[in-house]
Regions:
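Glycine-rich phosphate/adenosyl-contacting loop at the front of the ribokinase-like
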Residues: 1-69, 108-110
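Conserved N-terminal subdomain of the carbohydrate kinase-like
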Residues: 44, 48-128
């Protein structure tokens, strides 16, 4: 089993549309994306992350549940917000701007992770 621990956030992908820059939200974050891709490749995968108790946190948690990971543990932080990544594509290159200052994903409560529930744990991936 692979356990990926780290950020889960909203990727807001920007597109120019009739002179306005509009954004569509997707669930993302490198550790979460790794978990999803490993699961799609046939691995047994768990993910642990942390979001704020906000509309973005509820959105990414609901989207994460659709990934059908073998284990999903998304903690909720009552004091901090969920990270947002604004992503634009200009001249064929991705440009990132993060709304990230003391956000929930930097404050995972490792004492609340019950590692014993992850049977046959072979790989632990930590990311930000």
């Amino acid at each position: 089993m692979i356990l990926s621990i780290g950020e889960i956030l909203a990727d807001l992908i920007g597109e120019k549309n009739d002179g306005a820059l509009t954004f569509r939200a997707f669930c993302g974050g490198a550790p979460f994306n790794l978990a999803v891709n490993a699961k799609q490749s046939g691995a047994t995968v768990g993910f642990v992350g942390r979001v704020g108790n906000d509309v973005i946190g509820r959105f990414v948690t609901a989207e994460a549940e659709k990934a059908n990971l073998d284990s999903l543990d998304v903690q909720t932080d009552e004091k901090r917000n969920t990270t947002i990544a604004f992503v634009t594509l200009m001249n064929g290159e991705r440009d990132f701007a993060f709304n990230r200052h003391d956000t929930a994903d930097f404050n995972i409560d490792f004492d609340k992770i019950y590692f014993a529930k992850y049977e046959n744990l072979n790989i632990v991936h930590l990311g930000s």
